[in-house]
Amino acid sequence: MHSEAFDLKALIRPVVDFPKPGVIFRDITPLFQSPRGLRYVADQFIERYVEAEFSHIGAMDARGFLIGSIIAHQLNKPLILFRKQGKLPADVLSEGYQTEYGEAFLEVHADSLCEGDSVLIFDDLIATGGTLLAAANLVRRTGAQVFEAAAIIDLPELDGSRRLQAAGVPTFCLTEFSLSEY
């Protein structure tokens, strides 16, 4: 698989002052409305991970589900859902974390992973790294290990990728935006 050059940033809409004043939200819905754009993103991740040694894909609630499920299907890997608090029906492990908007909790089914598993964790965007750090902690609490954290977008000025790397979690993103970039 080889993907031609593509202007991914053109399919990521900046929404000013959402969800609160001073924030530029990176809306990926135009990307999902573009079959060519979505195929490009999927192909980039598949090319990177097709021969990688990991056992599971973990996807973050909710936009991480969109790309994580495609990659899990294409790579024939089990998909583990990391959900916002109160959304999973069985026994869960829970981890609190800070987001750029406040405090939140992430949960995963307690029986989703076990010792020896290796998980590629996906989200749409890395900002402060809080969600993916919480997921990494949950993975480690099951006895599994984190293979890498991947996202479509990185906001490097918010230090999320650096925080993940400092916690022993390698990161990979397809593109990045500065906080003031439109």
Curated annotation (Swiss-Prot):
Highest taxon listed in the record's lineage: Bacteria
Catalytic reaction list: AMP + diphosphate = 5-phospho-alpha-D-ribose 1-diphosphate + adenine
Keywords: Cytoplasm, Glycosyltransferase, Purine salvage, Transferase
Any Pfam family matching the protein: Pribosyltran
Pathway: Purine metabolism; AMP biosynthesis via salvage pathway; AMP from adenine: step 1/1
InterPro entries assigned to the protein according to its UniProt record, in alphabetical order: Ade_phspho_trans, Adenine_PRTase, PRibTrfase_dom, PRTase-like
EC number: 2.4.2.7
GO molecular function, one term: adenine phosphoribosyltransferase activity
GO biological process: adenine salvage; AMP salvage; purine ribonucleoside salvage
UniProt key word Cytoplasm: yes
Transferase is among the record's keywords: yes
PROSITE patterns reported in the protein's UniProt record: PUR_PYR_PR_TRANSFER
A Gene Ontology term for the protein's cellular component: cytosol
Subcellular location: Cytoplasm
Broad class of where this protein is predominantly found: cytoplasm
NCBIfam families for the chain: apt, PRK02304.1-3, PRK02304.1-5
Family: Belongs to the purine/pyrimidine phosphoribosyltransferase family.
Description of how the protein assembles with itself and partners: Homodimer.
Protein's job: Catalyzes a salvage reaction resulting in the formation of AMP, that is energically less costly than de novo synthesis.
Protein name per its UniProtKB record: Adenine phosphoribosyltransferase
Organism: Pseudomonas putida (strain W619)
